[in-house]
Structure formats: structure tokens, C-alpha cells
Amino acid sequence: MATFTRECLSPGATQGNGIGIVVNGTTETDIHECNTATDTIYHEVHLWATNIGTSAHTLILLVGGEDNAAAAVAQQKNFIIQPNETLYVSPGFTIRGASTHVEIQAKLATNTNNEVVIHGHVNVINQS
């Protein structure tokens, strides 16, 4: 029988804190990693992004690959977030164990630090 547990994002928000997206298009911020080699463990990731700045920002999520992996670029999701707006940007994107460091990363299309903050949680599903 499968078990379900809710956890904070890891590695970025282990205490439930928000994760500020830093730098720009060439540097990714790790949002969540599925650090298991067990292929019966799935991470269902829920993320909300808030723009605390005064201008719109394009948030780019890279879903499902390792650091700088081509697979993640193929699964790129773009969101335009207006000032003082919060968007639900990951409605349960699911990543699976089987290789370590399968993750979700984020970056901004513009060079503005910490004006977009991500909060969220992970439902860990163990089917073993």
C-alpha cells in the first residue's frame, strides 16, 4: 500500500521558508530535489511564486532533470508574474526517484535578485 507524507521543499526551504530566485538566465536556483535512487518514490511538487518587485518578471521553471541537464530544458515552463501577484506555478509536477538529484530549478529572464519568491510543499508518495 502506498504511503503519503507532506514535506518542505529541499534543499532550498527545509524550514518552510520562501526561496528567493537570484541572478538571471544563466544560473538556476534549486527549488526541490528528489534525492533517492528508489524508483517507487515519487515527489508531487506544489509551488507558488510571488513577485514582490515593482515590475513584471518572467519566471522559468526547469522540471525533471539534473543540474543543467538537456532534459530539464525540454521541460521548461515560463510564467509572467505581475507585481504583487502570486501564481500557482507547479500544480503537482511529479518527479520520480531512480537517479539522484532529479529536480525542479528556477531562474528569471531578467537580472533582478530576490524579487520573485517561491513557496511550496512536496507530497512524497512511496509505492513500495
Which role does the model predict for each range below?
Residues 1-40, 108-128:
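C-terminal interaction-tip segments
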Residues 39-46, 99-101:
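Short, solvent-exposed loop/turn segments enriched in Ser/Thr/Gly
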Residues 55-59:
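Short acidic, Gly/Pro-enriched loop/turn segments at secondary-structure junctions
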Residues 60-64, 119-121:
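Beta-strand signatures of extracellular beta-sandwich domains
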Residues 63-67, 108-110:
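Short acidic, glycine-rich loop/turn motifs
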Residues 66-103:
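Intrinsically disordered, low-complexity Pro/Gly/Ser/Thr-rich segments with frequent PxxP/GP/PP motifs
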